[in-house]
A protein has these predicted regions:
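Condensing-enzyme catalytic core mediating Claisen C-C bond formation in acyl metabolism
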Residues: 1, 115-195
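Conserved catalytic cysteine-centered active-site region
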Residues: 3-4, 31-83
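Phosphate/pyrophosphate-binding loops at sites that engage ATP/ADP/AMP, CoA/4′-phosphopantetheine
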Residues: 9-24
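Glycine/charged-rich beta-loop-alpha catalytic/anionic-binding loops adjacent to active sites
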Residues: 22-25, 48-59, 115-120
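Short beta-strand segments
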Residues: 29, 60, 85-91, 138
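Acyl-CoA/ACP chain-elongation machinery
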Residues: 81-103, 159-167
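Short, flexible helix-coil linker/hinge segments at the edges of structured domains or between repeats
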Residues: 96-119
């Protein structure tokens, strides 16, 4: 799962000498969590061995979820609110991009248009998106041993005010209107691969 991948990335930090008791902030980013609620961050926190209570943030979004988590972890330390934080990002896209998940949509499109382009669209995404995770510990001071780096700034800027957003999961634009998965039937969700 995406949660397990994130925890394994954090376990790598632990194996490298990170003490989870010295951390007080955890920021997790993912595009497609394993569950709708609760947030990915608390799911990850619950699986970190011997972790104390943390401030936890879950960042979502397609391409920027991991960097949004990194920015939160960075700001948590930069402002002095926390001495040490963890930023982790994980994705497990393979579980949702399997062909059988799109069979109803393919069949519906064949009926509607007799054009099977959906197969190419979904295959493209399946091969472009991969599973993986990475984690980093941020601290108010450099490491005593080993590699350290300093973050000078992180800018996350949206241009959704100028360009249409893309890569929906759980929604689509239909006839120039936003349609949420919550407002359609189960059959329509399957026929349009909204989830």
């Amino acid at each position: 799962t995406s949660t397990e991948l994130a925890v394994e990335a954090i376990n790598d930090l632990i194996r490298q000498g990170m003490n989870v008791s010295e951390v007080s902030c955890l920021a997790c980013g993912t595009s497609y969590p394993d569950q709708i609620m609760p947030g990915q961050g608390v799911m990850v926190h619950g699986l970190i061995p011997n972790a104390p209570p943390y401030e936890v943030l879950t960042a979502a979004g397609v391409c920027v979820a991991g960097m949004a988590a990194m920015k939160h972890a960075y700001n948590a330390v930069r402002t002095g609110e926390h001495q040490s934080s963890i930023a982790v990002a994980s994705e497990a896209a393979s579980s949702i991009m399997r062909g059988e998940h799109f069979q109803a949509e393919i069949e519906q499109r064949l009926l509607d248009e007799a054009k099977p382009e959906i197969g190419f669209e979904k295959d493209f995404l399946r091969w472009m998106l991969s599973d993986g995770a990475g984690a980093v510990q941020l601290s108010h001071q450099p490491n005593q041993h080993g590699l350290s780096f300093k973050i000078h700034w992180i800018d996350l800027i949206s241009y959704a005010n100028e360009m249409p957003v893309c890569m929906y999961a759980g929604a689509e634009i239909r006839d120039e209107q936003f349609v949420s998965w919550k407002n359609v039937t189960k059959e329509e969700r399957e026929a349009r691969s909204l989830m």
